[in-house]
Amino acid sequence: MNINFTLLAQALAFAGLIWIIATKIWPPLMNAIEERQQKIAEGLAAADRSQKDLAQAQEKVNEALKEARTKANEIIDQAHARANQIVDAARTEAITEATRQKDLAQAEIDAAANRAREDLRKQVSALAVTGAEKLLKREIDANAHKALLDELASEI
């Protein structure tokens, strides 16, 4: 066998192999690689979008929680304010009722004191009449001297 012929045959076989690979195998292989690259790029883009969506959702959740806390604090503040209003109203009502009862008691005390004064005036008038009877040793007509007795009673 001739070495030149062998080299030529190998060169032709190699060239044929290159041509077959370049026309039959290489294009589908490159298409498969490009499709795979596109799928990987789409997957990475989808992952990025998912991360962005997750970050946005997390922000929305945080904002919703913040808003819920704010509303809860407002409701609690309103409840405290309402409780304070109720306590103040009850306190005002209690003070009003206590003042009313105190005024009623004071009126009863004043009425009792006036009755006691009147009773005391009557007793003093009776004592004065009795004392005057004893001093004068005669009976004083109470009807005749009523004006005098009333004047004495008012002075007492």
Swiss-Prot record:
Gene3D superfamilies referenced in this protein's UniProt entry, alphabetically: 6.10.250.1580
Organism of derivation: Stenotrophomonas maltophilia (strain R551-3)
CDD domains named among the record's database cross-references: ATP-synt_Fo_b (cd06503)
Residues spanning the membrane: 3-23
Keywords: ATP synthesis, Cell inner membrane, Cell membrane, CF(0), Hydrogen ion transport, Ion transport, Membrane, Transmembrane, Transmembrane helix, Transport
Biological role: F(1)F(0) ATP synthase produces ATP from ADP in the presence of a proton or sodium gradient. F-type ATPases consist of two structural domains, F(1) containing the extramembraneous catalytic core and F(0) containing the membrane proton channel, linked together by a central stalk and a peripheral stalk. During catalysis, ATP synthesis in the catalytic domain of F(1) is coupled via a rotary mechanism of the central stalk subunits to proton translocation. Component of the F(0) channel, it forms part of the peripheral stalk, linking F(1) to F(0).
Quaternary structure annotation from Swiss-Prot or TrEMBL: F-type ATPases have 2 components, F(1) - the catalytic core - and F(0) - the membrane proton channel. F(1) has five subunits: alpha(3), beta(3), gamma(1), delta(1), epsilon(1). F(0) has three main subunits: a(1), b(2) and c(10-14). The alpha and beta chains form an alternating ring which encloses part of the gamma chain. F(1) is attached to F(0) by a central stalk formed by the gamma and epsilon chains, while a peripheral stalk is formed by the delta and b chains.
Main location: membrane
InterPro entries xref list: ATP_synth_B-like_membr_sf (IPR028987), ATP_synth_b/b'su_bac/chlpt (IPR002146), ATP_synth_F0_bsu_bac (IPR005864), ATP_synthase_B_chain (IPR050059)
GO molecular function: proton-transporting ATP synthase activity, rotational mechanism; proton-transporting ATPase activity, rotational mechanism
Signal peptide: none
One GO CC term on file: proton-transporting ATP synthase complex
Species classification: Bacteria, Pseudomonadati, Pseudomonadota, Gammaproteobacteria, Lysobacterales
Record gene name: atpF
Full protein name: ATP synthase subunit b
